[in-house]
Amino acid sequence: MSGAAFSRQRGQLLSDTLAAAKAEGRSALIAYLPAGFPTVDGGIAAIKAVFDGGADVVEVGLPHSDPVLDGPVIQTADDIALRGGVRIADVMRTVREAHEATGKPVLVMTYWNPIDRYGVERFTAELAEAGGAGCILPDLPVQESALWREHAEKHGLATVFVVAPSSKDARLAEITAAGSGFVYAASLMGVTGTRASVGEQAQDLVRRTRATTDLPVCVGLGVSNATQAAEVAGFADGVIVGSAFVKLMLDAEDEAAGLEAVRALAGELAKGVRGGD
């Protein structure tokens, strides 16, 4: 089977997974973990653990030396991964092994600069061959995304763009028209990290975004427990959780304890997106 044909199944798997959650009357649980943290093997084990706990989709972060949109927790994890020598090849391996072990959709979340340096065709081809479902590109402007989208579509990869409360309605329509898979709605202005409340802005942003697209709208940036997950699940198609998982691994006594902690949190959040059932 060709890489492109293989990946089209993976891109469809993402859409099917989100649709299946909706058919069950719930939001999807989407987890974020950086590749190479605490090690490449440890990162793969952590992804398997959150899938075991009940995550529907995982975003694999490509560690960056200047993650300007990420808070201190993810910055710390990225720094550990980079000091460990993580490379794009390790990210691809993480995607491949996580997907092959679970059969679940796995995306990459990355800033644009590493892809630009690596080569768009090379990156998309390798991600497709690894079984990746697509890519989340938080800092790639839609008006500069034509080359990426050409190659992503060629390889059957979803392109997920990020919208924010500051986005005007016309801008939302432009962003959602260019994207695929789902829309990532940033629930609070600023960088990622757990917060006491995900904020009322999130619900309004989801409403405004849905007015422009039939794509699922998934909310991230702030959710860290089942109560918040249930709150967001009441109005969003997916609940994205990252910093809370990473913090548990940073705070754990050892890797085994970290794996158990993220598995347990995924289970708690999975109950949250199901309304506590």
UniProtKB/Swiss-Prot annotation:
Belongs to the TrpA family. The keyword Amino-acid biosynthesis applies. The gene is trpA. It comes from the Bacteria. GO terms for molecular function: tryptophan synthase activity. InterPro entries: Aldolase_TIM (IPR013785), RibuloseP-bd_barrel (IPR011060), Trp_synthase_alpha_AS (IPR018204), Trp_synthase_suA (IPR002028). It comes from Streptomyces avermitilis (strain ATCC 31267 / DSM 46492 / JCM 5070 / NBRC 14893 / NCIMB 12804 / NRRL 8165 / MA-4680). NCBIfam families: trpA. It is an enzyme of class 4 (lyase). The active site is at E59, D70. The keyword Lyase applies. PANTHER family: TRYPTOPHAN SYNTHASE ALPHA CHAIN, CHLOROPLASTIC, TRYPTOPHAN SYNTHASE, ALPHA CHAIN. One of its GO terms (cellular component) is cytosol. It catalyses: (1S,2R)-1-C-(indol-3-yl)glycerol 3-phosphate + L-serine = D-glyceraldehyde 3-phosphate + L-tryptophan + H2O. The alpha subunit is responsible for the aldol cleavage of indoleglycerol phosphate to indole and glyceraldehyde 3-phosphate. Its EC number is 4.2.1.20. Tetramer of two alpha and two beta chains. Keywords: Amino-acid biosynthesis, Aromatic amino acid biosynthesis, Lyase, Tryptophan biosynthesis. This is Tryptophan synthase alpha chain.
